[in-house]
């Protein structure tokens, strides 16, 4: 990937100290979305990376994964599947719970959104601990989908998400990374 393009993306992401709590350096992807050139560059890089990969579906996680997953699916000519928090999807769903730092959360997917043999790309805005994507991958695999790739705009490698997802057999694509948390 083009070094200048990757630098533009990283520079467009604002860092908010002590948000949402003291000691956290929040990486705000919405500042990238506000910058037409940076957003367009991110999408072009993702399309270029995956245009010949043979995916049949792109799955995005709630909610910022939708902002990258849906336009990517359109450009790749495949369907987009949202993975959402409980009670947000109208048809029959399956769910997967996962652990957070203090508690747990649950994600859902429509049971008919992924067919056996679908080749799926998972995408989200940011990879931290990997819990959200791990739960998403489990949902896809339970429905018979083949998922071996996950894409992110931002990765925080010090939080262990990359290693966690690689242990699940996923190849990781990231447009930028920030050290620390």
From Swiss-Prot:
Domain of life: Bacteria
Keywords: Cytoplasm, Glycosyltransferase, Purine salvage, Transferase
UniProt catalytic activity: AMP + diphosphate = 5-phospho-alpha-D-ribose 1-diphosphate + adenine
GO CC annotations, alphabetized: cytosol
Localization of this protein: Cytoplasm
GO biological process terms held by the UniProt record: adenine salvage; AMP salvage; purine ribonucleoside salvage
InterPro entries associated with the record: Ade_phspho_trans, Adenine_PRTase, PRibTrfase_dom, PRTase-like
Matching NCBIfam families: apt (TIGR01090), PRK02304.1-1 (NF002632), PRK02304.1-2 (NF002633), PRK02304.1-3 (NF002634), PRK02304.1-5 (NF002636)
Quaternary structure and partners: Homodimer.
Protein name per UniProt: Adenine phosphoribosyltransferase
Organism of origin: Shewanella amazonensis (strain ATCC BAA-1098 / SB2B)
Lineage: Bacteria, Pseudomonadati, Pseudomonadota, Gammaproteobacteria, Alteromonadales
